[in-house]
Amino acid sequence: MNLKKYLSTAPVVATLWLFLTAGILIELNRFFPDSLFY
């Protein structure tokens, strides 16, 4: 159960959140290009 405690620490959660956000932005840019520039 030590792994679960490690996975819930702040740096790990922040890293996962950054990867998730970057992945969503990349996929949005792939399907809808130039949507970030009006």
Swiss-Prot record:
Q: Which residues cross the membrane?
A: 6-26
Give the matching SUPFAM superfamilies. Answer: Subunit IX of photosystem I reaction centre, PsaJ (SSF81544)
Q: What is the membrane topology listed in the Swiss-Prot or TrEMBL record?
A: Single-pass membrane protein
Q: Name one GO cellular component term.
A: chloroplast thylakoid membrane
User: Which top-rank group of organisms is this from?
Assistant: Eukaryota
**Pfam families, per database record:** PSI_PsaJ
Name a single GO biological process.
Answer: photosynthesis
Annotated compartments? Plastid, Chloroplast thylakoid membrane
Query: Its principal location?
Result: plastid
Q: Which UniProt keywords apply?
A: Chloroplast, Membrane, Photosynthesis, Photosystem I, Plastid, Thylakoid, Transmembrane, Transmembrane helix
Cite the HAMAP family for this sequence. Answer: PSI_PsaJ (MF_00522)
The family classification in the record reads: Belongs to the PsaJ family.
This molecule's function is given as:
May help in the organization of the PsaE and PsaF subunits.
Query: Can you say what this protein is called?
Result: Photosystem I reaction center subunit IX
